[in-house]
């Protein structure tokens, strides 16, 4: 006996030393020997496989001899080895699964709760240390694992009928990293979730009832997106209940694959037993940033029904109806949701609604769900975007039935709004489809005005209303809401657009009189209404002159005095004084009594003129070289027959050369006729570029003087008087160019 003990391998000795003597069923491994065994296998990883194989051999012997205590010690040793040697789990995990499978299949011991509980602890230790890298490509391990888990579920549920132990197994499976991403093992996730929900409904009957009732309309808006958990249905024993803990492990996770599978299992359960309390309770456990997935998957259930309708297959209207009700229940609950794509969900619900227009319950529930989407504000322009989207869809729909459905959807949303959330542009888009709800639309319109053109559309909207009572209420609301900015643009609008008496014109003046605080203005408006007359500008100027508000009075006077009211509404929306507006008609000034030629001479005789003063500048008019015929006519008639002045574009020296050549040719044709050729410098300069003036100022020649212009405080160029006795010199001689301006224009002689 001693000789056999001497030749026993060390790893077997260390394992055997961990087992206490005796046949007691509640044995525990020896602590010191177990610690040394753990140290041994941890420092010599090559011994792990030998230890695991020996444990299988020893367990097989213990099972055959019904040594329950030794089996319990083996299971505890396995749990400790897994926990301390998890880095090398792939070395021995298959042997451990084989060992546990031997225990489960032994009918003489698999009905012992103590043994199965220890086995569950060992299984949980393995699950917590499993990773996709261990089993991703190992088909043998996956097959063994699936077989073991299925057998474990069967033993616990059928032989032991232990619900808590079953829930513990579900919790163990939830700790496996990446199990939802593996196509061969992800079936375990919905199986565990359904098991936990069944247990929750069995223990708490309120989660099993059909409680889908239409929610009352909420006119009070919640604050912007909340991020803290709200109070939902409380369960007193939730913290200590394994079914609640199991659901927490599957739903309170950031693994989207696992969460997706878990929510699908929840929706499947809710289709058979619709219960909004169950939906709210579980949704509250989902991380707030991922709760929108519940709404998306419920919406997908509704879209599947719409696709079935399109393909011709029989859909389930009750399933779509329940899904819509569940969405509404979640949207109006106190559960916080962030990141919800409101427009995308609304468009999908609208598609189902229009495809199912024959089913009135489904159409109505779609409308309720769309309205509930706007129950919480996820971003500032949410309501406006929803209404704009409906307006665009209404304009594109040709079917009248579908158009009426969309208009009713729009009314349903508007009826649920209690705060100003739409702008004036959207208001003018909505009114043509909701003529009976003009007052309500005005009440939910923001006070901010984007621009002057918006006000014109606002007045036009009031003019398009057929009911006079509605017109009167609408105009009063407009003045109450935009009192500070509507008065002057309104005066400008009605002066420009109203040529014949109409009721809206008098409504404006009634409210304008109240705003200005002029009683006589109000009574005069009533007389004009009775007589069917319009105000003259002089009458309105009198009232604005006597206005209590001087700012309104001054701007109103300027509007009335301007020609054809050529003032932008944008200028009327600010507090700056208006810029003067000039009439396009000629002014009746003293210049108007002077003939055009005299006006031209007066302008030419001004001490300083720039290019902008005369359209015949040398830079903007094409230069014309004088011809011999022009000179002949000038000699005969004393003036040019053409109104266009003779100009030259050459330099001074080349210009003198050209003129000398022309003179010689002229003498040859008119022998003996002494003609007096006028020096170009005798005429006044018609236009000089500003840059040329600057050059002339920098190099003052003897032919120019500088005069200080008192009115403009700038140096003006005045050409010097040229002696009429000056004669041209031949081009062969050197010519000194004293003038620095190259663009003088010759006036007609």
Swiss-Prot record:
<protein>
    <recommendedName>
        <fullName>Protein EFR3</fullName>
    </recommendedName>
</protein>
<feature type="compositionally biased region" description="Polar residues">
    <location>
        <begin position="637"/>
        <end position="652"/>
    </location>
</feature>
<dbReference type="GO" id="GO:0072659">
    <property type="term" value="P:protein localization to plasma membrane"/>
</dbReference>
<dbReference type="Pfam" id="PF21072">
    <property type="entry name" value="EFR3"/>
</dbReference>
<feature type="region of interest" description="Disordered">
    <location>
        <begin position="633"/>
        <end position="652"/>
    </location>
</feature>
<comment type="similarity">
    <text>Belongs to the EFR3 family.</text>
</comment>
<dbReference type="InterPro" id="IPR049150">
    <property type="entry name" value="EFR3_HEAT-like_rpt"/>
</dbReference>
<dbReference type="InterPro" id="IPR039786">
    <property type="entry name" value="EFR3"/>
</dbReference>
<dbReference type="GO" id="GO:0005886">
    <property type="term" value="C:plasma membrane"/>
</dbReference>
């Amino acid at each position: 006996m001693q000789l056999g003990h001497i030749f026993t391998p060390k790893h077997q000795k260390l394992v055997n030393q961990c087992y206490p003597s005796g046949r007691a069923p509640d044995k525990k491994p020896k602590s010191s020997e177990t610690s040394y065994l753990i140290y041994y296998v941890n420092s010599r990883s090559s011994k792990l496989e030998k230890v695991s194989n020996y444990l299988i051999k020893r367990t097989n012997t213990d099972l055959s001899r019904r040594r329950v205590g030794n089996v319990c010690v083996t299971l505890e040793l396995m749990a400790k080895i897994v926990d301390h040697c998890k880095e090398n789990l792939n070395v021995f995990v298959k042997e451990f699964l084989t060992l546990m499978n031997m225990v489960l299949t032994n009918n003489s011991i698999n009905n012992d709760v103590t043994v199965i509980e220890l086995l569950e602890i060992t299984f949980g230790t393995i699950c917590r240390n499993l990773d996709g890298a261990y089993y991703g490509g190992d088909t043998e391990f996956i097959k063994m694992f699936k077989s073991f888990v299925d057998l474990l579920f069967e033993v616990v549920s059928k032989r032991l009928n232990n619900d808590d132990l079953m829930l513990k197994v579900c919790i163990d499976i939830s700790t496996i990293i990446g199990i939802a991403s593996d196509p061969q093992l992800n079936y375990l996730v919905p199986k565990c979730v359904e098991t936990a929900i069944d247990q929750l409904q069995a223990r708490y009957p309120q989660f099993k009832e059909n409680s889908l009732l239409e929610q009352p309309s909420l006119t009070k808006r919640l604050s912007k997106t909340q991020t803290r958990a709200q109070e939902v249905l409380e369960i007193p024993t939730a913290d200590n209940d394994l079914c609640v803990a199991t659901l927490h492990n599957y739903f309170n996770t950031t693994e989207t694959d696992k969460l997706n599978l878990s929510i699908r299992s929840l929706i499947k359960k809710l289709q058979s037993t619709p219960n909004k309390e169950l939906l709210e309770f579980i949704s509250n456990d989902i991380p707030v940033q991922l709760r929108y997935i519940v709404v998306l998957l419920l919406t997908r259930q509704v879209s599947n029904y719409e696709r079935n309708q399109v393909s011709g297959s029989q859909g389930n209207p009750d399933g779509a109806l329940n899904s819509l009700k569940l969405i509404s229940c979640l949207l109006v609950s106190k559960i916080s949701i962030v990141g919800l794509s409101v427009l995308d969900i609304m468009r999908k619900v609208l598609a189902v609604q229009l495809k199912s227009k024959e089913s009135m319950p489904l159409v109505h529930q779609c409308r309720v769900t769309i309205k509930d989407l706007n129950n919480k504000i996820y971003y500032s322009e949410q309501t406006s975007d929803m209404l704009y989207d409906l307006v665009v869809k209404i304009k594109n729909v040709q079917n009248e039935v579908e158009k009426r459905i969309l208009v009713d959807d729009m009314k349903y949303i508007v009826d649920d709004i209690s705060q100003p959330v739409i702008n004036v542009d959207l208001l003018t888009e909505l009114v043509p489809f909701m003529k009976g709800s003009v007052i309500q639309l005005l009440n939910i319109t923001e006070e901010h005005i984007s621009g002057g053109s918006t006000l014109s559309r606002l007045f036009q909207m009031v003019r398009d209303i057929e009911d006079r009572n509605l017109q009167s209420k609408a105009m009063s609301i407009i003045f109450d809401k935009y009192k500070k900015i509507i008065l002057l643009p309104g005066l400008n609008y009605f002066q420009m657009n109203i040529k014949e008496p109409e009721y809206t014109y008098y409504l404006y003046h009634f409210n304008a009189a109240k705003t200005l605080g002029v009683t006589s203005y109000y009574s005069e408006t009533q007389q004009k209404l009775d007589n069917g007359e319009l105000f003259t500008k002089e009458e309105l100027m009198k009232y604005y002159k006597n206005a209590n508000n001087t700012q309104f009075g001054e701007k109103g006077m300027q509007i009335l005095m301007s020609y054809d009211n050529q003032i932008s509404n944008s200028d009327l929306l600010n507090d700056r004084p208006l810029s003067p507006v000039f009439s396009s008609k000629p002014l009746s000034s003293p210049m108007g009594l002077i003939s055009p030629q005299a006006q031209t001479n007066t302008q030419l005789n001004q001490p300083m003129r720039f290019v902008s003063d005369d359209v015949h500048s040398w830079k903007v008019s094409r230069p014309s070289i004088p011809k011999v015929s022009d000179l002949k006519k000038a000699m005969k008639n004393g003036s040019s027959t053409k109104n266009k002045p003779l100009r030259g574009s050459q330099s001074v020296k080349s210009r003198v050369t050209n003129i000398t050549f022309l003179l010689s040719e002229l003498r040859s044709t008119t022998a003996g006729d002494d003609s007096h050729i006028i020096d170009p410098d005798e005429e006044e300069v018609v236009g000089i570029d500003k840059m040329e003036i600057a050059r002339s100022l920098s190099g003052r020649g003897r032919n120019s003087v500088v005069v200080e212009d008192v009115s403009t405080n700038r140096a003006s160029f005045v050409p010097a008087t040229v002696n009429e006795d000056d004669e041209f010199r031949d081009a062969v001689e050197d010519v000194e160019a004293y003038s620095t301006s190259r663009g003088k224009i010759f006036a007609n002689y």
